[in-house]
Amino acid sequence: MPKLAAFPKAYMDDLVVHGTMTLRQWIDLAATLDIDGLEFYTGLIDLQDRSRWPEARKATEDHGMTIPMMCASPDFTHPDPKFRQEQVDKQKFWIEMTAALGGTYCRVLSGQRRPEVSRADGIEFAAQCIETCAPFAAQHGVTLNIENHYKDNYWTYPEFAQKMDVFCDLVERIKVPNFGVNYDPSNTILAGEDPLVLLERVKHRVVTMHASDRTLISGTIADLQKEEDSIGYAKRLKHGEIGQGMNDYDAIFSTLKSVGFDSWISIEDGVDGFDQLKGSVAFLRRKMAQHWGPQYGTSNRHA
C-alpha cells in the first residue's frame, strides 16, 4: 500500500543550521497534514545526540505517524580513501539512526562530481562504499536507496551520478539485495533529461520516491547548469507546488503501479509556505486515489 510522507524542505536551515526550529515543532506542524509519516534529514540538530532518538520517534508515533525514510548525503566519490572511509562510518551512524527511529530506508548518494575524478573511478568509489555499507544496513533491517540526485543543500559540486547513464551504470553495478532507487522526477529535468525515460530504465529497482515539482524562476536549464559549482542550490531554481510544475504525475504513477510499487512517496516541497505543502498533499492524495484506489486518498489519521 503506497503511503505518503513529508520532508521539511522549507525548514532545513532552521532545523539544520540555525536551530531556530525544534524537531518537535516540525513534527507537530507536519502532523496536521493528511500524511502517514515523516522523512528526516541526518543533519537535523536534534538528531545528533543518539540519546534523543527515542524522543523523536515517540513524538512522531504519538501523532499516528512513522519515520520510514532517512535522507542522508554521503560523499563517496572523493579521491582520498581515508575521506571515503570516514563517509562510510558516517553512513553507518545514519543507518543506526534510521533503525532507531523505526525507519527502513536510508538514502545513499554517489557523491560530489569533482572535476579530478573520472567517471570510471567515481562509479567504482561509490559502488565500493555502498556495498561496504549494505551488510551493516541489512543487520539493522534497513534498505539503502540511492537517489537520482541534483545537489545536496550544503555541497559545492553537483551529484556525480546526476546524469542518467552514469546513474544507471552505478545502480546496475550494485547487486546487494537491500538496495534500490529513490526516484525523483524533478532531478532528471535538472539534468536536462526526461524523467519518464529514467523511470522506465529503473522502474523495477524503485523502492521509494521523492515527490516534487520544479520550475525555473528565470532563464533556462542551460543557465542553471552554468551555476552548478556554487555552494548550495542555484538561485534560479525553485521547488514548486506539486502538480503545477513540469512533471507528469499520471504517467509516473501509472508506471509505478504497473510494476507493483507499494512503498513510500515523500513530499519534497513547501518552500513558499505551509499552504503550498498542503496543496501538494491534496494533489498527491487525489492522484494516489486515482491510480491505486480510493482508500489511498487519505491517511485516515484525522478520521
Residue ranges and their predicted role:
Residues M1-D34, A161-A303:
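Histidine-acidic metal/acid-base catalytic patches
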Residues M1-G103, D121, A127-E131, A138, ...:
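N-terminal pre-domain/capping segments
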Residues A10-M12, T42-L44, S73-F76, S110-R114, ...:
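Active-site-proximal loop/turn and secondary-structure-junction residues that shape catalytic pockets
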Residues E39, M69-C71, R107, N145, ...:
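Conserved beta-strand positions in the central sheet of alpha/beta enzyme cores
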Residues D49-R50, P79-D80, V117-S118, T156, ...:
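Short Asp/Glu-rich motifs
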Residues D80-P81, Q112-I123, Y150-E159, H239:
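Surface-exposed cleft-lining segments at the edges of enzyme active sites
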Residues T98-R119, H140-N153, S266-I267:
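Active-site groove signature of glycoside hydrolases
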Residues Q139-K175:
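Basic- and aromatic-lined ligand-binding clefts that recognize polyanionic substrates
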